[in-house]
Amino acid sequence: MIYLDNHATTRLDPRVLEAMLPWLTDHYGNAGSATHEMGREARAAVDAARESFAAAIGATAREIVFTSGATESANLALLGTAARVAATEPAAARHHVVTCATEHHAVLDPVAHLERQGFAVTRLGVCPQRGAGVPGRIRLDDLRAALRPETCLVSVLLANNEIGVLQDVTAIAEIVHAHGAVLHVDCAQALGRMPMDVDALGADLASFSAHKFHGPKGVGALYVRRRGRAVRVEPLVFGGGQERGMRSGTLDVPGIVGLAEAARLAVAGLADEVPRMRALRDRLWEALARGIPGLALNGPALDGHDAAGRPLRLVNNLNVQVSGVDGQTLLATLARDEPAVSSGSACSSESPRPSHVLLALGLDEDQARASLRFGLSRFTTAEEVDTAAARIAAGVARLRA
């Protein structure tokens, strides 16, 4: 199987599995059981993993809360912050949330829930595919205009899971903090694909999923700033009081060990993997463009950089528009003979509606439906890229005939 859907999930690295196996078999103690050796060794493994993961993202160990993944982390960040505000602020005093129209549904849906609970919500648009600005980026002037004295929280996606655009989070953080609001950053797609330092980004809260960087599914983390501008969130789950009371439930020791090892490997391999994945991504684009007349790129230019020299797009991301072809029909054709690709977020891939991200870029519904998303990984090879491009071009030719 040629797998090019690495924004949906990634292959578990064998080295991560090796690190996890002892905690699935011989060392299966509960990290909350301090009365015997098996419990204490499980707790020691969790503590070591917390230190390791914190180092990988530029945090301290006490700023890490282990969760089931970025969706839970985002919900805890957003709903937990809102609950804190509701408990400590007069009604409507700080009950305004700002986010972006191109966020993942792990953010959009809890924000919609807050709106139903009485919070005011502003959803920022982004620069269009054709027009001024970087396609998919938030206009900073729009953010400034959206902020109010009652704004308590802003949530942005560092790296978009569909079009790969990288938001200028450091600039966003300066604006948000000047207004006294809390900034949540969805970092699910970023770790292992770009340098990661949550403190330098200016994030107050940041969410992560292990399975996005070759770790196990079902485990993630929430970064909660405790240095300088320390923030507090209310828990959403109650019971055993684990994770300093912020996330009750028996800790997934094997998963947490796997998360930390996957993050360590992602950071250790960054210098080699970033240029390698960029070269493969560009190779894929060039091969597709040669084989498919009229192919168009969705999102920022592949070689685009901002004024500070920072890339505008994830190195492993490609999103293309195939005119005259329905994306779902093409995917069904490809499913018979590979490669594995998608038309958008895995969390909404069964929806008949076109991608909300592409619609926010200004594409019409037909253009959005005619788009394909590719995500490369450390396991993607040049041979796979070449074969995938040839098969996709052949599939498009059959559908256009």
Where are these regions (language model features)?
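Pyridoxal 5′-phosphate
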Residues: 1-401
